[in-house]
Amino acid sequence: MSPESKKLFNIVILGVAFMFMFTAFQTCGNVAQTVIRSLNSTDFHGSGYTSLAIIYGVFSASNLITPSVVAIVGPQISMFVSGLFYSMYIAVFIQPFPWSFYTASVFIGIAAAVLWTAQGNCLTINSDEHTIGRNSGIFWALLQSSLFFGNLYIYFAWQGKTQISEHDRRTVFIALTVISLVGTVLFFLIRKPDPENVLGEEESCDDQDMEATESAQNNVTKAVDAFKKSLRLCVTREMLLLSVTTAYTGLELTFFSGVYGTCIGAVNKFGTEEKSLIGLSGIFIGIGEILGGSLFGLLSKNSRFGRNPVVLLGTLVHFVAFYLIFLNMPGDAPIAPVEGTNSIAYIRPSKEVAILCSFLLGLGDSCFNTQLLSILGFLYSEDSAPAFAVFKFVQSICAAVAFFYSNYLLLHWQLLVMVIFGFFGTISFFAVEWDAAAIVARGSDYRSI
């Protein structure tokens, strides 16, 4: 297998492994609040929003030290161990207790920080300036296809149900745990890419022995250097500007992955289909994500206009979705009690409009995330692990804040927050992309997505 083929193989395996893991985890997140509402009529008392706020809060706090972990153990082992913790969190729902539920939330927050830093590192070392756009699109399309498969099962299994029984819950989460473990094992199929500089004849065996004896010291040095780079990157102009865009992706991630499905499940006007519509919503979010990731991956070598038009498309698509949701969904839907809400917004709640908005949310999200992955891989190709750690730090802390306020804010206020951050995030991304275009003009052969 040629070096380029090996790198492409690694990207595909990386995407497929994440597809399995996040088929389980994103489906879990999408239905968690609905499942817990049903559990709260028993001895269990908890909040899916609070759990996700803990996950993303710990995730953000852990991100600045994860480059050190990845530098020492490597991306492959980092992703495998993280996958085990993801599986543990999902398994908690088989027989949940408040203490195990919230404890697992803490552990998966740490695991997520390691996982995504390692993923960014793996993506970058298997790409160059010519392939980073294509590889970002391939990975994103495979990752987001996870939304399709898990939610397809939820749609058919929960059709006509108004409450989630213990048998339904256990069946779903046992299956999701197994799926997550399959994805975790797939990380072992990723091969180490061929080094650019092969050991020359002039280097003696003594040199290799010396390297082996100094490996422990080198690991400590790598860890310290990675941590220092993370802190330095936080205050660079490009990263500060991209942080506004990243903050927006954290807010809208919270909305489409946890809040919107809960809103749909709480609208009594949807009748007996309200719970199964959660699954259908997740499917159409996934279709939007897959379409966007595939399209921008295929166009990565041919676009002459850079990333800005794609981000602008994402902004417009999201703003249309937010307006339609504002018209279609009752304001109290995110915080409705277990009985749901009978309120009506500005139009009678429409299933078709709700599902269209799901598709638009997914398409817009893919616009932002594929371009952020691409520009980070280009600007920080030598410091990929710290750069992706800072990216995930900002994204996750904003997601945590959003999950926290989702317990209290009415829907229209949540939409307003996202519109404000979306507008300024788009402007700040444009500024960084113009800088990247200037780098290209000075002599780089990089082709932007």
Curated annotation (Swiss-Prot):
Top-level taxonomic group? Eukaryota
Quick check: keyword Ligase in the entry?
no
Keywords attached to this Swiss-Prot or TrEMBL record, sorted alphabetically, are:
Glycoprotein, Membrane, Phosphoprotein, Transmembrane, Transmembrane helix
Which GO CC terms are listed, alphabetically?
membrane
Record: glycosylation sites: 40
> A Pfam family in this protein?
UNC-93
Q: What is this protein called?
A: UNC93-like protein MFSD11
Report the gene name: Mfsd11
